[in-house]
From Swiss-Prot:
Record text on subunit structure and interactions: The protein envelope of the sulfur globules is composed of the three different proteins TR0, TR1 and TR2.
Its biological purpose: Structural protein of the sulfur globules, which are intracellular globules that serve for sulfur storage in purple sulfur bacteria.
Pfam family, any one: SGP
Family: To C.vinosum CV1 and CV2.
Protein name, as recorded: Sulfur globule protein TR0
Regions annotated as coiled coil: none
Length: 40
């Protein structure tokens, strides 16, 4: 599912079946502040 990703350089929370990399590297496919962990 789609969840909020906190910080572009910190941990991303919420990504389930989206992208594990966004979750680990902190919303790498979204914004640098607040985005969607799992895409963008």
């Amino acid at each position: 599912w789609w969840g909020p990703g906190y910080g572009g350089y910190g941990p991303g929370y919420g990504s389930g079946l989206g992208d594990a990399f966004s979750d680990m590297f902190g919303d790498g496919y979204g914004d640098f502040n607040f985005g969607m962990s799992g895409g963008g």
